[in-house]
UniProtKB/Swiss-Prot annotation:
CDD domains: DHQase_I. Belongs to the type-I 3-dehydroquinase family. HAMAP family: AroD (MF_00214). Homodimer. Involved in the third step of the chorismate pathway, which leads to the biosynthesis of aromatic amino acids. Catalyzes the cis-dehydration of 3-dehydroquinate (DHQ) and introduces the first double bond of the aromatic ring to yield 3-dehydroshikimate. This is 3-dehydroquinate dehydratase. NCBIfam families: aroD, PRK02412.2-2. The gene is aroD. 3-dehydroquinate binds at E27, V28, R29, R53, R175, Q197. Pathway: Metabolic intermediate biosynthesis; chorismate biosynthesis; chorismate from D-erythrose 4-phosphate and phosphoenolpyruvate: step 3/7. The active site is at H111 (proton donor/acceptor), K138 (schiff-base intermediate with substrate). It catalyses: 3-dehydroquinate = 3-dehydroshikimate + H2O. Keywords: Amino-acid biosynthesis, Aromatic amino acid biosynthesis, Lyase, Schiff base.
Amino acid sequence: MIAGVVVARNAREAVAKIREGNADLYEVRLDRFESFELAPLKPFADRLIITIRRAEEGGFRRIPEEERLELYRRAMTLKPRYVDVEARSEIAGEVMREARKRRVGVILSHHDFEGTPPFETLMEILQGMASMAPDVVKIVPTANSHLDNVRVLRLYEHAENLVAFCMGPLGRISRLFSALLAPFTYASLEKAVAPGQMSVEELRQLLVMLDGR
């Protein structure tokens, strides 16, 4: 499955992009929203990943943690498929507890915009996140060499319900492999949100080519 990343100023604009999109799931980046009337998203809830990314891991703006937690709580009243929260954030535990109460899936994420650590460190990160028992673990460092992709893709040998790939131009190949190995992967609906991100259409075409072989 492919999750299209929705970057919009409000829910109505997000809905318009979802209606035009051809993804299986849609990650709605509430950290980009300028207003928070979320009701228009309700009809699409079972296909939504709600993300309120903190600035330190690629968020569009700096939002106080208490405000982020309240936004997560409001968003979870929609009953989305998943919420995505960073493992290193102060509110991760509380978001996960609230999600379990509401029977909303949790993606626990880790992003590194500087590089890719050694495989042993990646395994420590994976094991630490898995110990928190999320529904999906997401690990996304940045590739500074082609070998960084190999380090990250090796994680699939040690975990299920894992989404792992590299950002950056050198990480594009790992994004393609993640579409084959992960429960879902991410692609842009329009302009790339993260370095090296493919569009939904581009990723679908590559997957068709691989399937044809």
